[in-house]
Structures are given as structure tokens and as C-alpha cells.
Amino acid sequence: MKLTCVVIVAVLFLTAWTFVTAVPHSSNALENLYLKARHEMENPEASKLNTRYDCEPPGNFCGMIKIGPPCCSGWCFFACA
């Protein structure tokens, strides 16, 4: 039981150490990531996650059985809603 706990703690420590040392060489890399995320929260247009280039706009044919890209709205009944 003690050995299992020691192994679990060691794995968690090594995993955390890997993530800490995997940061780019800049001394304020974590701060830059935080500021970028905060900027995207304050300005949703700056976020790349909000844009979908692989979806069909409303009115386009979307198919009966998911032929082609999905609709941007998520609703498909022969044509995107």
C-alpha cells in the first residue's frame, strides 16, 4: 500500500515537472499565456475558437445523411437552418 502511494506521488511529481520545464525559454511565458487568454475573454472577436471555416452557412444544402461539412448552426434538415 505504501509503495503504491509512493509510486502515485512520484508519477504526479514527474508529470508536473514535465509541464513546468516544457514552457518555452521565455521567463514570462506563463504570464503571456494568461494575458492572451484574458484578452480573448475580453474581446471574443480575437479568439480563433469562435470562427468555423468548415461549416455550411444557412440555406445551403447539407444532405440527408451528413454529406459534406456540418451546418454552422448545427441544424440540418436537407438545408442548413
Curated annotation (Swiss-Prot):
Modified-residue entries (4-hydroxyproline), positions: P70
Subcellular location: Secreted
Known role: Omega-conotoxins act at presynaptic membranes, they bind and block voltage-gated calcium channels (Cav).
Modified residues (6'-bromotryptophan): W75
InterPro entries for this protein: Conotoxin, Conotoxin_omega-typ_CS
Tissue specificity field: Expressed by the venom duct.
PTM annotation: TxO4 is found with and without hydroxyproline and these two forms have a bromotryptophan. Truncated TxO4 is found with and without bromotryptophan, and these two forms have no hydroxyproline.
Keywords for this protein: Bromination, Calcium channel impairing toxin, Disulfide bond, Hydroxylation, Ion channel impairing toxin, Knottin, Neurotoxin, Presynaptic neurotoxin, Secreted, Signal, Toxin, Voltage-gated calcium channel impairing toxin
Taxonomy, superkingdom: Eukaryota
GO cellular component: extracellular region; host cell presynaptic membrane
Name of this chain's protein: Omega-conotoxin-like TxO4
GO molecular function: calcium channel regulator activity; ion channel inhibitor activity; toxin activity
Positions annotated as propeptide: 23-52
Disulfide bonds: C55-C72, C62-C76, C71-C80
Signal sequence range: 1-22
Similarity-based family: Belongs to the conotoxin O1 superfamily.
Keyword flag Secreted: yes
Domain remarks in the Swiss-Prot or TrEMBL record: The presence of a 'disulfide through disulfide knot' structurally defines this protein as a knottin. The cysteine framework is VI/VII (C-C-CC-C-C).
